[in-house]
Amino acid sequence: MNRIMGIDYGLKRIGIAITDFLRITASPFDTVKNVSLKKNALKILEIAKNRDVSIIVLGLPLNMNGTEGGMAETVRKFIEKIKFLSDIEVTTVDERLTTVQAERMLIEEADISREKRKGIKDKVVAALILQTYLDIQSDE
């Protein structure tokens, strides 16, 4: 069984998480710099190929009322670019409050300083996005 990749697509950084081969746990993997839609998509697809990923799950940033804001449009453009370059399956999950949850985890549970959180937060958010997807799949 191939792995699943979770992505937190941000304006400056892209957080990446990957499951184990059994698709049970989501683990933070890496954070890459956001360069351009095409370069970002190529980098993600390269990692996906090297890590035997068959599904990519992106967090879709929704407003608290459930509507899509400007960043959701950017995420959808990124999805279009990935689909243009590859036939890998791409899906989304609601990522509302995952950044807040990650911040809280890193401060309260891991006691990580603000400076160190910058480099870790994005991939932790990606892991939360991916775990949300896994939880939804296990409920179906």
Curated annotation (Swiss-Prot):
Query: What domain of life?
Result: Bacteria
Name the UniProt key words of this record, in alphabetical order. Cytoplasm, Hydrolase, Nuclease, Ribosome biogenesis
Q: List the GO molecular function terms.
A: nuclease activity
The places in or outside the cell where this protein is found are: Cytoplasm
Respond yes or no to whether keyword Protein transport is given for this record. no
Keyword Hydrolase found: yes
Q: What enzyme category does the UniProt record give?
A: hydrolase
Q: What is its main location?
A: cytoplasm
Annotated Gene Ontology cellular components are: cytosol
Tell me, which GO biological process terms does this entry list? rRNA 5'-end processing
What EC number(s) does its UniProt record assign?
3.1.-.-
Pfam families on file? RuvX
As for family, the record states: Belongs to the YqgF nuclease family.
Q: What is this protein called?
A: Putative pre-16S rRNA nuclease
